[in-house]
Amino acid sequence: MAAAEGDGGVRAEADRELEELLESALDDFDKAKPSPAPPPTTTAPDASGPQKRSPGDTAKDALFASQEKFFQELFDSELASQATAEFEKAMKELAEEEPHLVEQFQKLSEAAGRVGSDATSQQEFTSCLKETLSGLAKNATDLQNSGMSEEELTKAMEGLGMDEGDGEGTILPIMQSIMQNLLSRDVLYPSLKEITEKYPEWLRAHRDSLPPEQFEKYQEQHSVMGKICEQFEAETPTDSEATQKARFEVVLDLMQQLQDLGHPPKELAGEMPPGLNFDLDALNLSGPPGANGEQCLIM
């Protein structure tokens, strides 16, 4: 009889602890850290053997396991299925129209997964990115030559989930985003700044050995690089979107000028990041003569 009463007391204690644990979990549901473990039962564990888990610990494990399962089912069901279906539909439509471009995106994705801190993997990723950008540029040219209206192009981009903003400048926004990343301060500034600082000494050392025309080109290169660095140095965290866009257009124009001047000296070009000397002409960013800035950027 005493044993039965003891068992009933243990069960009652476990039920009370479980109830307190559930109430605490509901109160702290949004907190990152779990609630403190409930106080141990009155039965002390045997110090000579492994400690037994209390009913409260077991209940807590079951609670967190059920929460994890709940969120996993949530993200693995309707939301994920819908997003996956939309993406697969968009990629299928793109594959029918531009199979080569889809293949390049797949290669780019694989290269991004392999990229590391070594120069070889970075070079592989950059090379793949260049091919993808060239494909995007060619695709943009084909679309422009096809006579398709901007409204039709915008609708096509929206079908691929690539629309941005209020409808203005939505033609190939992914290309603009990639170019903004490639021409950002983080990518360009460190190497360009180092080359710019070393250029004057190099020019003095090679002034007499270079043909006058080539020497002038190198001088102009140095000047353009300095202007690009000045644009990056003028950046502030509080810059408005309009200011950032205007600066991007200036940097893009200066990079085109730099491209027109040819490659920098090999002694200095070695300071450039692997694969940074991509061909801006291949991206068709300059646009037709007389085109305004927005058309040039294919934004």
Swiss-Prot record:
Keyword annotations of the record: Acetylation, Cytoplasm, Lipoprotein, Membrane, Methylation, Peroxisome, Peroxisome biogenesis, Phosphoprotein, Prenylation
A GO molecular-function descriptor: peroxisome membrane class-1 targeting sequence binding
Entries under InterPro entries matching the protein: Pex19, Pex19_C_sf
Domain of life of the organism encoding this protein: Eukaryota
Chain intervals for the UniProt region annotation (Necessary for PEX19 function on peroxisome biogenesis): 2-91
GO biological process, one term: protein targeting to peroxisome
Keyword Translocase: no
Annotated compartments: Cytoplasm; Peroxisome membrane
Pfam families: Pex19
Full protein name: Peroxisomal biogenesis factor 19
Biological classification of the source: Eukaryota, Metazoa, Chordata, Craniata, Vertebrata
